[in-house]
Amino acid sequence: MSRVTFRSAPGPGAAPHVPPGLESAIDATATSAAVELFAAYRVTIAPVTGPELQLPIPDLSALGIVRFTAPGLIGTTVLGVSTGTLRRSNMRGTSDRDWVAELANQYIGRFKLKLLRMGFELWSMTPVTVSGRLLATAVSQPDFAPIAFRDAKGGSVAVWIEIDIDGPLKVTPPASDGEIPREGDVILF
């Protein structure tokens, strides 16, 4: 079962059509992008599923929100992080709000690059942040459970991805490995 939410765009129309394999690929990509992002900052997180997942996730201190688009879809990614996990990953000592925005930006970058390597291209917008306490009720919907993680010290990370399909999705043959930058590469243009 996918933890990424796919739905039809508001208005009349058919149910969302996602090409075979793309839904599970997006779900796996969403999970691996989070694990790899926090590993880059020496914080190990592991997925939480089934009865271990408690909603709402009680200790999220800040959320970074990023909108993204592609032909045929519009989506939102929300990255929520507990105070302890957020601060353990922040080696530069910036504010929690700035750091969760940076993590959300890096998360969507990793997510996009992984999908691009599979032939699916997304464009993202600048992240915004919100205090976790402001969204406690909005993110506790039982039918909108996050991709949830715990770190070794009990901290939490949660990722919600919602995708509205409003037309045919375009998946192209993947570019060659050398054409797509790796996570963390510096790109000058």
Language-model region placement:
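N-terminal auxiliary interaction/assembly segments of multi-subunit proteins
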Residues: 1-189
